[in-house]
C-alpha cells in the first residue's frame, strides 16, 4: 500500500498522483482515509498529457464503486479541473461511455444541493437535456430535471413533458456549468440548442449556485 499521508501526497508531482490514483486497490482497507479532494487539488490538468488526464478520470471511476467517495471532491476543485483541462483532454475522456457517465452523473447528482431554494420555490418546470455523441436514442445521452417546490429531481428516463429541451455537446456543458463558458455565446455559435420556453431557459442557470474555479 503506498503512503497516502497528506505529507506524502504533497510531495508528489501531478503525474505521480495520476499513477497513485490509477494503482490504488479498491479493496484496500486504508482507502476510506484518502482525501480525494486534496489529491485532485494538487493535480493541474494543464501539466498532464491527454492520456494522463484520461487515466486520472478512469482511476476515479474505478474507485467510485469502492470505499473512496469520489463525490467528496469539492465543487470548486471540480470546476478548476474542468477549467484547466484542454478541449482535447475533455473530448478524449468523454468518448469513453463509463467515464462520461461518471462525470455527467456526478453533475446531475449535485443539482439538488446547488439549487437556490429561495429562487426556485415558485418554479415548476421540467427540463430535458440531450448530450450529443452518446449511446442513447438517436445518439444522445439524456437526463431529465424536474424543478418543483424548491427541489430538483433527476431522472435518466423522460417521465414528463418538457418546458424546455436543451441539446449540446457534453464538453460545452461541462464548461457552462463550471462558469468556463457563456450560454449566449454557445447559443449564438450553434453549440447550444434550445426548444421550448426560451425566456425560462435564459434564466434557468440563475436557479443554481454554479461553482467557480
Where are these regions (language model features)?
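Feature captures hydrophobic
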Residues: 1-213
Amino acid at each position: 500500500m503506498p503512503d497516502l499521508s497528506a505529507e506524502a501526497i504533497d510531495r508528489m508531482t501531478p503525474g505521480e498522483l495520476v499513477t497513485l490514483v490509477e494503482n490504488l486497490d479498491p479493496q484496500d482497507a486504508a482507502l476510506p482515509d484518502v482525501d480525494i479532494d486534496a489529491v485532485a487539488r494538487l493535480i493541474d490538468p494543464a501539466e498532464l498529457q491527454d492520456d494522463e488526464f484520461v487515466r486520472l478520470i478512469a482511476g476515479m471511476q474505478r474507485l467510485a464503486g469502492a470505499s473512496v467517495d469520489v463525490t467528496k471532491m469539492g465543487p470548486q476543485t471540480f470546476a478548476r479541473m474542468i477549467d484547466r483541462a484542454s478541449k482535447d483532454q475533455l473530448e478524449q475522456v468523454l468518448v469513453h461511455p463509463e467515464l462520461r457517465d461518471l462525470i455527467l452523473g456526478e453533475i446531475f447528482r449535485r443539482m439538488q444541493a446547488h439549487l437556490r431554494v429561495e429562487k426556485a420555490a415558485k418554479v415548476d418546470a421540467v427540463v430535458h437535456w440531450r448530450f450529443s455523441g452518446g449511446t442513447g436514442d438517436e445518439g444522445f445521452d439524456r437526463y431529465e430535471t424536474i424543478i418543483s417546490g424548491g427541489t430538483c429531481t433527476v431522472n435518466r428516463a423522460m417521465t414528463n413533458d418538457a418546458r424546455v429541451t436543451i441539446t449540446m455537446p457534453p464538453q460545452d456543458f461541462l464548461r457552462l456549468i463550471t462558469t468556463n463558458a457563456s450560454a449566449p455565446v454557445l447559443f449564438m455559435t450553434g453549440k447550444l440548442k434550445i426548444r421550448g420556453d426560451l425566456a425560462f431557459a435564459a434564466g434557468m442557470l440563475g436557479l443554481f449556485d454554479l461553482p467557480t474555479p
